Amino acid sequence: MDAAIQYILYFAVLVVLAVPLGRFMAHIMDGEHTFLSPVIAPVERGVYRLLRIDAAEQMGCRRYLASVLVFSGIGLVTLVALQALQSFLPGNPQHLPGVSWDLSFNTAASFITNTNWQSYSDETTLSYLVQFMGLTVQNFVSAGTGIAVMFALIRGFRQVKEQGLGSFWVDLTRTVLYVLIPLNLVFGICLAAGGVISNFQPAQKAELVEPVAVQPNADGGWSVIDGAQIEGDTVKVDGKVVEGARVVTEQFLPQGPAAPQVAIKQSGTNGGGFFGVNSAHPYENPSAFTNIIEMTSLLLIPAACCFAFGIGVKNTKQGKAIFAAMFILLVIFTGIIAVNEHAGTPQLADGGAVNIEMTDGQAGGNMEGKESRFGIASSSTWSAFTTAASNGSVNSMHDSYTPLGGFVQMLQIALGEVVFGGVGCGLYGMIGFAILTVFIAGLMVGRTPEFLGKKIEPGEMRWAVVLCLATPFAILVCSAIACMVPGLADQLNNGGAHGFSEALYAFTSCGGNNGSAFAGMNCNIPWINVMLGLEMLFARFMPIIGTLAIAGSLAKKGKVAESAGTLSTTNGMFVFLLVFIVLLIGALSFFPALALGPVAEFFQMIA
């Protein structure tokens, strides 16, 4: 019962907060007066004067796209330079060295694309300056870019025989100033009050209560020695000295300005953690209070985008229909993960090896890789939310989920981040599927497809296909190439079906702009870093190109009057068709690959 209440609470809070935020975002898009205008409007005008931005400019789709690409390219080069020059810059109390060229490129590509894939452990790789001047800035502007492109698409549907889609620079400025900064100021204060650390102190060392004996392992790291007898600096097991063993007496305690960066990495669907284990770290997510704030903020803006879309196109029912389709998919996927994690596995229950019964004192089920302070309900919901969005943050280890739990995580990402997805990009990704749906429905009834009063013709259909298939293409092609490289197996912690799942998840995560990982694959080698970086760039900007092409084409068209034969795109039937098409495309694209990974592992588990 407690678990059921948690699931209901998380979904209810999301819906209640998303509706007013969506209404607010629609006002921001059109530059209307809001309760924040007296404070922020002077700053907005100052930014326009400083950067010589024409607030009244109307860009065509090509100029809008060029602005997006140039802005992102500048961010890529700047972030690579910051990492390479890290050792010469201030704000580096740990005196960390510069980052290698391949990891710098991978990280820069990851953060400008809103993916936040991390082939490194933050606290031992990047300085405070690089984190808050490089990564955090990109967390804001990459999220703002996605919302700006969504605004352009809305104007494409709304305009009648016009060329302009608005100004990218104005849309980006308004999004950052009115939405992202105020929202994350509130979230950051709440997280800091809840115990998330926020300082600029160097890492601290603390004495352990008891010393621990470790020895080198095959992976180049250290493993704890079971049954060790420590006598000074000497380690013995059963009376015999262990050669090469080391006695650890101190613990490394990372510090840093985590709270404000955690806020934007959640609300901007960025996902890159301040610490290596992300929001499973007690410094980043210490309690149930911070957990619900971080989990709610994770999907808040993507959900609000649905309502902003409805208001923006002057058809609130359409926004609600898109939201309903996304919400239904999310509930289904969350339910599948939750049922499998609460049930555990036959191997855990075999002969009473592990007590998987739910009691007042324990969560039961499959608790491997999960934090006891969160349990299965909060962990399962987070994993569903973070893979539905293009977020990728974690409060548990996805590599330790049951086979079907991992299957759902990968499937949600592989669908093309359309189950709410990233800020802005999730909405325009789902619109691509909506256009595909009305096209198929139009074929069935013999009518030219229409959507929101605009005829959908071959030009829009070609770009809608690009929008829907860019992510599957990137994931499957890159995964296939990687699997043909002989050295890939050496980078995996496991073999067989689960080893394949680890590799497939990595390329799925980067192709879906998600950033989460099974963490069973060493990706910090040059060829993998470069391949993943290129995949992230392709999977981010091809859908943007398709979206702006559709927006530009629709803006030039006139409105078509509704008739008795016009397909309604706001009723339950359309919602059902949209959900069906999303699942159909996902199944046709990915089931063969998923069958070799998590599905095969599931049948091995129950055999």
Predicted regions and their residues:
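Membrane-proximal intracellular helices of multi-pass ion channels
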Residues: 1-607
